[in-house]
Each structure stands twice: as structure tokens, then as C-alpha cells.
């Protein structure tokens, strides 16, 4: 062991402890950065739905289904209503949450007994529900909740970085220990 190289066990344990602590904090920073990336991506996906003032998770009432999703391209209300009436699904309530040239984001409420007709329209026009899990919060509130989580991770990372910088005081000790190990090994 370290003793046979003229290096004390206590010294070896101290150096090992410092190195392990630094590596552990570095791994935590990496994991937090990955989580921050995922949170930011979720926030971006939610942004088009900011105009929705009900939780995205609401999918039905006693008598109606509620759907949130998007269509490719820019759709106006007239075009949407025409697409639904062509399939005999006139009794739908549609809210255009946001519309851009490339996407139209919708919230649709319709009677449960019209589900087959509405699903046919969805297939025909390419209606796509969000790929993320729907929240029991409104999109605005969910973005705020995610932001709070992201800020906590950023703050945690700042703490780790400060702790790692404080470990600089052990750098000479670690280098000296490592050099002595190498020298002993080369004997």
C-alpha cells in the first residue's frame, strides 16, 4: 500500500477524500446541467400554449372531451370550422391559442357522443397532441414551476463550483502526493 512508499495512510486517506469529493461535485454539476437542459426544453415546448388558461391535463368533463394540440401551418377559425363541419362535427368549441405560419395551437372541447367524428377530423387535418406529459397546472404556472426548479439547480451548481474552488487549497497536497506515488513506483 501507500505505507511501503513512505506515504502515511492518513495522508493517503485525506488526499483520497479530497479527490473523491471534487469528482462527486463534478458529477453532480453534470447531472444538474443535464436536468437544466431538459427543463429548458420543456419550457420551450410549453410556450406556444401560454394563452391557455386551463390546466393542460383536463381531458374531459361529464359530457365533453377536451383536447390540446397543434396543426402544421397557419389555420384560421373559418378553415377549422369548415374541416369539422365536413365530417358532421359542427358542435365543437375551438380556441386558437396561438397561430404562426408554421403551426397553429388549439384547445378543442366537444361532446363525448361526437368523438368518432372529431377523431376523424383530427386524423384528416393532422391534429397532434403534445409529446410531453400534460400538467395539472396551466401552461403559465407550469413554466413558473419549471423555472423555480431550474433556478434551484443553478444555485446548487454555484455552490458546488465554490466548493470546488475552495478545494484549490488541497491542490498542492494532491499534486505532491501523486508525484511521490509516481516516484516510488518508478523505483
Residue ranges and their predicted role:
Residues 1-187:
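Long, charged N-terminal accessory/stalk domains
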Amino acid at each position: 500500500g501507500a505505507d511501503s512508499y513512505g506515504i502515511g495512510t492518513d495522508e493517503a486517506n485525506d488526499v483520497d477524500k479530497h479527490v473523491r469529493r471534487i469528482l462527486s461535485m463534478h458529477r453532480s454539476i453534470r447531472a444538474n446541467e443535464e436536468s437544466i437542459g431538459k427543463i429548458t426544453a420543456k419550457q420551450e415546448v410549453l410556450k406556444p400554449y401560454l394563452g391557455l388558461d386551463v390546466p393542460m391535463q383536463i381531458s374531459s368533463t361529464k359530457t365533453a372531451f377536451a383536447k390540446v394540440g397543434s396543426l402544421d401551418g397557419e389555420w384560421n377559425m373559418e378553415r377549422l370550422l369548415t374541416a369539422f363541419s365536413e365530417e358532421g362535427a359542427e358542435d365543437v368549441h375551438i380556441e386558437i391559442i396561438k397561430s404562426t405560419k408554421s403551426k397553429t395551437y388549439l384547445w378543442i372541447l366537444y361532446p363525448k357522443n361526437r368523438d368518432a367524428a372529431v377523431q376523424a377530423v383530427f386524423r384528416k387535418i393532422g391534429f397532434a397532441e403534445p409529446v410531453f406529459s400534460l400538467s395539472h397546472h396551466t401552461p403559465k404556472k407550469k413554466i413558473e414551476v419549471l423555472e423555480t426548479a431550474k433556478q434551484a439547480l443553478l444555485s446548487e451548481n454555484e455552490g458546488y463550483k465554490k466548493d470546488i474552488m475552495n478545494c484549490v487549497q488541497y491542490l498542492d497536497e494532491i499534486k505532491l502526493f501523486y508525484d511521490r506515488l509516481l516516484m516510488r513506483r518508478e523505483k
